[in-house]
Amino acid sequence: MNEIISAAVLLILIMDPLGNLPIFMSVLKHTEPKRRRAIMVRELLIALLVMLVFLFAGEKILAFLSLRAETVSISGGIILFLIAIKMIFPSASGNSSGLPAGEEPFIVPLAIPLVAGPTILATLMLLSHQYPNQMGHLVIALLLAWGGTFVILLQSSLFLRLLGEKGVNALERLMGLILVMMATQMFLDGIRMWMKG
């Protein structure tokens, strides 16, 4: 039980639902509330499916594509960096996701890389490699972490009402700065792994 809880805490910290709130709100701010909820449920379910696939078959997928784990880290860092720059310096039209106003996101950037990002996918591969006989526990931990993320992100409209548009914009820029640092670290970790390999 302790292993499940510790793994779930680790996974939810990596998923970072509170950090992702401003990005989700920004990407979906031109969408009607009912449609926004449906999109979020769809994107979160896609993210869960991707995470489960990587938990069970991540190493095999990378081997099949002749990709190394550091490739996931480097490419993920680049994508997150570009998203972060758009958060800090939003264009006059559209939003920080790079989508035109009113256009619906599909898979990128919400499901991947924000919820099911390179860090969580690499962590799931690592956990499945370290604990091959405890896959049931790992699945439960993943479902708990995903469930917590699901609940927090579905309450984004509540945060929007509490913070207001200016508050969300300020939070978005702050998270953009943090995301730049996280993306840079992810990129550097990938480079470090590549140089060691």
UniProtKB/Swiss-Prot annotation:
GO cellular component: plasma membrane
Compartments, as annotated in UniProt: Cell inner membrane
Membrane topology of this protein: Multi-pass membrane protein
Superkingdom: Bacteria
Signal peptide region: none
Cytoplasmic side: 25-44, 93-105, 160-173
Pfam families: MarC
Alphabetical keyword list: Cell inner membrane, Cell membrane, Membrane, Transmembrane, Transmembrane helix
Residues exposed to the Periplasmic side: 1-3, 66-71, 127-138, 195-197
Record field: transmembrane: 4-24, 45-65, 72-92, 106-126, 139-159, 174-194
Parts forming coiled coils: none
Entry-linked InterPro entries: Multi_antbiot-R_MarC
Assigned protein family: Belongs to the UPF0056 (MarC) family.
Protein name, as recorded: UPF0056 inner membrane protein YhgN
Gene source species: Escherichia coli (strain K12)
